[in-house]
Amino acid sequence: MYRKDSIIIEEWLKRSDKALLVTGARQIGKTWLIREEIAKSGYRKFEVNFIDQPDLVDYLNVKMSANEFLVKLKMIMPEDCKPQETVVFFDEIQKCPEIVTKIKFLVEEGSFKYVMSGSLLGVELKGITSVPVGYLTVLRMYPMDFEEFMIANNVSKTTLEMLKAKFETCQPVDEFIHQKLLWLFFIYLIVGGMPDAVKIYIATKDIREVDKVQRDIVALYKEDFSQYESEDKKLKLISIYDIIPAELNKQNKKFVFTMLNKELKFDRYENSFLWLKDAGVALPVYNVEAPVVPLKASKSSNVFRLFSNDTGLLTSAYPAETKLELINKNSEVNNGAHFENAVAQQLTANGLEPYFCKKKNIGELDVLVEMDGKVVPIEVKSGKAYKAHKSLDNFMKISDCHIEKAYVLSVANMEQEGSVVYLPIYMCYLLKERKIGKLIVDLDMEGL
C-alpha cells in the first residue's frame, strides 16, 4: 500500500549520510515500509529485531566502546553484507536503546547505512543521555491518512489532482464525486488508518473483520502499558485510554479528570497523559488563551481534549449501532467526536499542531493551527447547520487576532463566503503548510 513516508525513506537511502530513526505508535506500518524501501533500493539488508531475537539485546546492549560494538556487530553479519552495500536495520530499538548512543561513531566510521525503528521511543529514549544530534534524521510516522486511504481504495490520481485544483481555486466538486468521497470518508471513520485494518477491509469489505483487527491492536497497546510500566501506572494509563471515547462524546469535549477519580488532581496523572502522548497512542489538543502566533506561548498544559491516534480505533470502542449510523451517513446523529478525531489526526499527520480556544463572551473555536506563519481557525461541523458558527464570527472580528482566513469542515460541498472557506470534510488532508523550494540569499560583500 502507498505511504507518503516512502519518499522520505527513499531519499534517505539515496542521499543522506546520517542514520535514520523511524518512530511512531505500534502497528502503523514502520517495519513494513522500511523493508519495502530497502528492497527497492538495491541495498543488502541486515535486520536485527530485538523482540524476536532477545539474546541479541544482551549481546549488543552492554557498556562497550563504539569500536567494540562495531566488531561485535560484524561478527553476527553474513559475509555477503559488504561495506557500502548494506543497510543495517535495528528494529524494536526500544528494547536496546544503548545503540542510539553509538550512532555517531557508526555514521562517522561509514561502513554501513543504519536505520532504527520501534514503538514507545518517545518514552524509552527519554533516559538516553547522549542522543547524537547532527548524525540522526528522525521520521515520525502516523496511521494512514485519508489521502492514503483513498489511494488504497483505488481513487485515481486524476481525481486526487482534481481535488487539489478545486481546493486551490475554491470551486465545488462535481456532486456525484462529492457524494462518493463523502461515503468513503465515513467508511474511513470506521476503518481508520491502521494498515492491517485497511488491508482486511479492502480484502473482505467486512466491518466485523476490521473490528477484530482493531481490538487486537488496542489489546497490544494495553499490553505495552503493562510491559513497560508499574502496576499502579498501568492502571492509570488504561483508565485514561478507556475513557477517551466517552469524553469525546460529551458536548464539552474537554478532558475532565474527575471522570477518573472525584478526588483527582491533574499533577497526579500528568505523567500518564504525557506517556500516552509520547507513545503515540493519544493526541492531546491543548487550549490556548490567545489565538495569536505563536500559539504554543499561551497553551494551558492542564486544559486539553484527548483524541485517539486513529479514528478507527476510536470507533471500535463504540457500540455496533454507531458504525451503522456512520455507514448510513446519518447527519441527524451527532458524529462530532468522529469528525473532530479525524481532523486532529489528519492535521497532526500533516505536521501541524492543533489547539482549541475557549474564551468568555466570545465562544469556543474547535481548532486553531499555525500555517505559513498565520493563525488559521477551523470549525468542524458534523450536522446540517454548518453555516451557524457564532464563535468563529466573533473571533474573526477581533483585530488583535489578525485572522485572514478560516475553514469550516462539514459534509457540504466547497464554497467561499468572504474569508470563510466551507470545505468538504474529506478535503482536510489538503490543509498543510506550503512547501518552500530553495531560498538562496546571495550577498555581494565585495568592497567592504
Question: Residue locations for each model-derived region?
Answer:
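Hydrophobic positions on the alpha1 helix immediately C-terminal to the Walker A/P-loop
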Residues: L33, E37
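Accessory nucleic acid-recognition modules appended to NTPase machines
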Residues: M194, K199-L365, V369-D372
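Conserved lysine of the Walker
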Residues: K30
